[in-house]
Amino acid sequence: MLNVIATGLSLKARGKRRRQRWVDDGRVLALGESRRSSAISVADVVASLTRDVADFPVPGVEFKDLTPLFADRRGLAAVTEALADRASGADLVAGVDARGFLVAAAVATRLEVGVLAVRKGGKLPRPVLSEEYYRAYGAATLEILAEGIEVAGRRVVIIDDVLATGGTIGATRRLLERGGANVAGAAVVVELAGLSGRAALAPLPVHSLSRL
């Protein structure tokens, strides 16, 4: 039994050392570099691995595609570590459908807390709590389960990939508060500063890793 515990602690320590090899106080080391060499910020990593797609999903919208970022093991790990730092103190993480699921689950694992999936309308079995909202390219609905998951009284941080107008995170906040949760803040990978989403969510604390 002692050997099993010792092995578990050793693996955990090795995992921590692996993270520290490339993440150090918000800085990310390039592949193959030592900690003594120059590093780049998490924001720079996000920017370098974000793809701009014009006229998607509708004409006139420039879509920020974070798929290359999430597919890069160092990029994903750096983003996870940085978001987990900003979500510290939460006892539940809420991830927004769909790309928010990727980072929310990773952050929840890092913090050793649970993750709540905030789904698009019609994806969850009833009963549900629903909230309609408006985004840059039309109306939409978000839902969470009304039964089976206790959110009342829990300190929740909302995690998503992109903050644009604030409609999605605002609807998520209203859903969680209707369920009795204490929404402590929101953390996103990319904030589109020109769309005033942060102002729309005030006074909710909002943390972003990159402002584009």
From Swiss-Prot:
- The catalytic activity of this protein is classed by the Enzyme Commission as 2.4.2.7
Q: Give a yes or no for keyword Thylakoid in this entry.
A: no
User: Which pathway does the record list?
Assistant: Purine metabolism; AMP biosynthesis via salvage pathway; AMP from adenine: step 1/1
Question: Its domain of life?
Answer: Bacteria
The protein's annotated catalytic reaction(s) are: AMP + diphosphate = 5-phospho-alpha-D-ribose 1-diphosphate + adenine
- BP-aspect Gene Ontology terms: adenine salvage; AMP salvage; purine ribonucleoside salvage
Say which enzyme class the record assigns: transferase
Record-level GO cellular component terms: cytoplasm; plasma membrane
Name the keywords, alphabetized: Cytoplasm, Glycosyltransferase, Purine salvage, Transferase
State one molecular function term (GO): adenine phosphoribosyltransferase activity
The SS bond pairs are none
InterPro entries to which the protein is assigned, alphabetical:
Ade_phspho_trans (IPR005764), PRibTrfase_dom (IPR000836), PRTase-like (IPR029057), UPRTase/APRTase (IPR050054)
Described function:
Catalyzes a salvage reaction resulting in the formation of AMP, that is energically less costly than de novo synthesis.
Question: What name has this protein been given in UniProt?
Answer: Adenine phosphoribosyltransferase
Organism of origin is: Mycobacterium tuberculosis (strain ATCC 25618 / H37Rv)
